[in-house]
Amino acid sequence: MNFRCFESLAIEVPATGAVLLGNNAQGKTTILEALCVLVRLQSPRSRRLASLVRSGSEGFGVAGDPWQQERLARYARDGLTLKVDADPRPNQGSFLTDGGLVVWMGNEDLDLIRGPGEQRRRYLDFLGSQLDPDYRRAWSRYRRALRAKNLLLKDGRSRDAEIRSYEEILVASGSVLMESRARFVAELVPLAAAAQRVVSGMDETLTLIYHPASGPDLREAMLQARDRETRLRQAVVGPHRDDLGLRLNGMPAGEFASEGQLRTIALALKLAQGRLLEQRAGKHPIYLMDDIFGELDPARRNALMNHLPAQSQKWITTTHLDWLKATPAVDAIARFRVADGKVMG
């Protein structure tokens, strides 16, 4: 394995999922993260797979059969080795095509509301990469071209022709991202609003608004920004600067929502993500819930669990079970204790 703190680990859980109980810094979150990498080849906690390698190791490997389908992902400095039912997959796209879907919930989700735009872009990107292979490819091309353009701008020399060539890629792939994000947000709006009412138990109105940083015409925005980008030595327009506006009862949620409302909005956003994945793909995502239940009151915990599809697989981490009796739906899930890098049933 050699994944973060684990040199090796084997765990067998029921199809319904597992509750992982243990103190902080014992590896509970890492288990959820490894499952996310196995399913989606990406971590919600890091953009780079290299950062997941256990200290002193050359790479990591994760394997499992979450849907009666043996999957293996092995990372090393020279690339990824991917297999499904022992058959090699030549690239990430072919590995992900018949794979599963993931919704990750954690306390860091509060940053979706009160944090910088990067957090909300990651929310949209994690959704988009699962919904649409074209989105995943466009985002990969966009990031590579953006990195190259920024390097040329930082160089400071006149290299206009090279910069323009990368801008053509940025316009083509960026337009795909913008159109997709606008469509995703439009589909999320009613789902998030419904989830907000269910979890809060109140008639609260949650509204999502897509804000493309470049306006509707990306090519024209880049043209208008050329002098500014030359002066600042970085690209200042494009989907990498987009944002997702969140309003509660007509007011900016990050400025006016209470702590309880912030937690409810974060849950509503992730529940909406899960429902949209289910509607589009026709299958239930795995819900990975990292230490969120201890921070919720019984009403919100039960509303959350009742809103999740009964057939979905749920993995939950927690440091204590004081809240468990008040949440019968969680009490029915198998429990495991995690301590010192070991998992005990």
Give short role names for the model-derived ranges:
Residues 28:
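Conserved lysine of the Walker
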Residues 64, 313-320:
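Structural recognition of the conserved hydrophobic beta-strand(s) that form the central parallel beta-sheet
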Residues 36-119, 123-135, 186-194, 219-228:
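Nucleotide-state sensing region of NTPase/ATPase domains
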Residues 290-292:
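Walker B catalytic acidic pair
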Residues 111, 118, 122-164, 168:
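Long, charged N-terminal accessory/stalk domains
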Residues 287-288, 316:
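Hydrophobic positions in the central parallel beta-sheet of the AAA+
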Residues 1-23, 37, 49, 161-172, ...:
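Conserved NTPase motor "head" modules and their coupling/switch loops across ABC/AAA+ ATPases, GTPases
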